[in-house]
Amino acid sequence: MNSIEFPLLDRTTQNSVISTTSNDLSNWSRLSSLWPLLYGTSCCFIEFASLIGSRFDFDRYGLVPRSSPRQADLILTAGTVTMKMAPSLVRLYEQMPEPKYVIAMGACTITGGMFSTDSYSTVRGVDKLIPVDVYLPGCPPKPEAVIDAITKLRKKVSREISEDRIGSQQENRCFTTNHKFHVGRSTHTGNYDQGLLYQSPSTSEISSETFFKYKSSVSSHELVN
């Protein structure tokens, strides 16, 4: 497992007093106490549940699962995200205090998976709703891969600068690595307008004249069938 680049200590005096910067101290405290909000909707989340056991013991990384987004600084999405649950996911992310991070776990969360080919209600990538810091592919990813993703996120936190973090835009916070996959022909655009998520469902009203006109032109047997 790769070692984490902890913030450097400036100097140590003769009285064993350690001096450092406030930015390094803040990064060290945050990377050592990530509190995740677990958002599992499918089978990938079962692999994450195995991390709670004694074999992997993810508590040693300072991870304390929280049930409230207001107490979490990391949200881990695992499983398929549908259009109906998209507003709830966006609302949970907006309720999390800054700085906050996102780990997308599994193929269904990253691209929609096998449900994105012929499903009209599947979001083809959670990054169309919220910014993602670490992508964790797999179907499902192994617990060791989840630990590696958390390690990469901790490295990212250790290198952050408070001024850059405040001034950076949300769309530029993604963290990923180069891959060797070849991009094929796109069959689905997967572009979703977040403004549509907050609109109330429209109701179509049929006038009584149109209804009775259609009813008179169709026999009662056809209406039953």
Swiss-Prot record:
Binds 1 [4Fe-4S] cluster. It is an enzyme of class 7 (translocase). The keyword Nucleotide-binding does not apply. This is NAD(P)H-quinone oxidoreductase subunit K, chloroplastic. NDH is composed of at least 16 different subunits, 5 of which are encoded in the nucleus. Its EC number is 7.1.1.-. NDH shuttles electrons from NAD(P)H:plastoquinone, via FMN and iron-sulfur (Fe-S) centers, to quinones in the photosynthetic chain and possibly in a chloroplast respiratory chain. The immediate electron acceptor for the enzyme in this species is believed to be plastoquinone. Couples the redox reaction to proton translocation, and thus conserves the redox energy in a proton gradient. Pfam families: Oxidored_q6 (PF01058). GO terms for biological process: aerobic respiration; electron transport coupled proton transport; photosynthesis, light reaction. It is a peripheral membrane protein. It is found in: Plastid, Chloroplast thylakoid membrane. One of its GO terms (cellular component) is chloroplast thylakoid membrane. It comes from the Eukaryota. Keywords: 4Fe-4S, Chloroplast, Iron, Iron-sulfur, Membrane, Metal-binding, NAD, NADP, Plastid, Plastoquinone, Quinone, Thylakoid, Translocase, Transport. Coiled coil: none annotated. It catalyses: a plastoquinone + NADH + (n+1) H(+)(in) = a plastoquinol + NAD(+) + n H(+)(out); a plastoquinone + NADPH + (n+1) H(+)(in) = a plastoquinol + NADP(+) + n H(+)(out). One of its GO terms (molecular function) is NADH dehydrogenase (ubiquinone) activity. Belongs to the complex I 20 kDa subunit family. The gene is ndhK. Its cofactor is [4Fe-4S] cluster. [4Fe-4S] cluster binds at C43, C44, C108, C139. It comes from Liriodendron tulipifera.
